[in-house]
A protein has these predicted regions:
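A short acidic, Gly/Pro-enriched loop at the edge of an enzyme's catalytic core
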Residues: 242-255
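A short glycine-rich, Lys/Arg-flanked "PGG" loop and its adjoining helix->strand segment in the class I
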Residues: 268-280
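C-terminal lobe and adjacent flexible extensions of AdoMet/dcAdoMet transferase-like proteins
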Residues: 349-379
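A short SAM/SAH-binding and catalytic strip from SAM-dependent methyltransferases
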Residues: 254-265
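Class I SAM-dependent methyltransferase SAM/SAH-binding core
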Residues: 199-243
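Conserved class I S-adenosyl-L-methionine
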Residues: 189-198, 285-307
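Conserved alpha-helix/loop element of class I SAM-dependent methyltransferases that forms part
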Residues: 167-188
Length: 379
């Protein structure tokens, strides 16, 4: 049996389809002091979303364009100047806060990128532009492809490869495998936590299925693309996986992490934090994991399959071949327990897929009449 619909490009909802999102502080917890995070100011509507300040007992965190930035406040040279963003928001300088947060996502912002972003924001904020079309609509009307070209500018091979990774993500085998594994996630598992969400491709999948999802990443610019274009019904939070997860205990009912975990240095700390924020019995999926025998071109901290088996031991992991999961998916099925492999059988594999649970049991993937990646509409 093969589902009938062909794949779409971005499973994106337009802004008019956006549902009611939770308040920015809902379920947030400071990764530093462990205290609850609450609103310190009223939310104010600004360019591309709401702006405000959140706080706990030890720090304040800005909300820029509807995205809470839960990063540790650091000095003037920090990649994301959290304190400076807070001062801009308190002063009502929302356009400057947006530009600063977006530029801070770049390791080395190019002059051309700075100019193009500054000009676009100024144009969107001009009185004439506001009369013709609200700023958020100006950005939503701009394609995600064009925004990604701004995020990774220039003709260099590295920028082109990274840009194409996000543009053509729905057609990648590892993305298809992730949706096959995610087929076991049900509506009553919500909300789902999407770790290292990037521009929100997996978040769009859950939104199209009517499952609430929180997407987190350290890259504010990619999250902004996700919130405005790719998955506007999802909740986005900017945070650092190395610092732990900034959420309350047992807040999530499932989690998925695609092509990210091997870039995390402190893996044990992240998994300990994940066990805290997941409810009892929650399924978890770590997809497109690089392993140290085949680490790929980009610097990472991949482990051998046996290392992942040890690290995930408390979650009773099952290991799958990406090819096996994709083959099942193309036949209209999710993975079956019998498809699981012994970790050392995957030493030559490009990617490793892991399914586990937080004190529950393994579920078999469901069959589907419609490919999950064909849900939703073009952006």
């Amino acid at each position: 049996m093969q589902p009938s619909r062909a794949p779409t490009f971005f499973s994106a909802s337009r802004s008019e389809h956006r549902g009611k999102l939770p308040s920015p502080a809902a379920g947030l917890r400071c990764p530093g002091c462990g205290g609850a995070i609450e609103a310190a100011t009223e939310a104010v509507s600004g360019p591309l979303g709401d702006y405000g300040i959140l706080r706990c007992d030890c720090a304040e965190y800005p909300v820029v364009a509807g995205i809470p930035i839960i990063l540790a406040p650091r000095g003037p040279g920090a990649p994301m100047p959290v304190r400076a963003l807070g001062r801009m928001i308190r002063a009502g300088e929302y356009d400057r806060a947006l530009q600063t947060a977006a530029e801070s996502s770049l390791t080395r912002p190019t002059r051309a990128f700075r100019r193009s972003l500054r000009d676009r924001i100024k144009g969107a904020l001009s009185p004439g532009s506001r009369k013709r079309l609200p700023p958020i609509d100006r950005w939503v009307e701009q394609s995600a492809v064009t925004l990604l070209e701004r995020r990774f500018p220039g003709p260099g091979a590295l920028n082109r490869e990274i840009r194409d990774y996000f543009v053509f993500r729905p057609g990648h085998a590892e993305h298809v495998a992730a949706m096959g594994l995610a087929s076991v996630i049900r509506a009553d598992d919500a909300p789902v936590l999407d770790l290292g969400a990037g521009a929100g491709h997996m978040a769009a999948h859950f939104c199209a299925a009517g499952i609430p999802v929180t997407a987190i990443d350290q890259d504010f610019f990619l999250l902004l693309i996700g919130r405005l274009i790719v998955a506007p019904e999802a909740r986005f939070v900017c945070c650092d996986l190395e610092e732990g997860l900034p959420f309350a205990d047992q807040f999530f009912g499932a989690t998925i992490c695609v092509n990210t975990f091997h870039f995390v240095r402190n893996k044990a700390h992240l998994l300990g934090s994940l066990g805290r924020v997941l409810r009892q019995g929650s399924p978890l999926f770590f997809c497109a994991l690089r392993q140290s025998h085949n680490p790929g071109a980009f610097r990472n901290f991949a482990l051998p399959p046996s290392g992942y088996a040890r690290l995930f031991e408390e979650f009773e992991p099952r290991f799958f071949s990406t090819d096996d999961v994709v083959d099942r998916y193309l036949d209209g099925d999710g993975p079956r327990p019998g498809d699981a492999r012994v970790p050392d059988d995957l030493l030559r594999a490009t990617f490793v897929e892991i399914a586990g649970h937080n004190g529950g049991h393994h579920r078999a993937g469901r069959s589907f009449d419609q490919w999950p990646h064909a849900l939703g509409t073009l952006g």
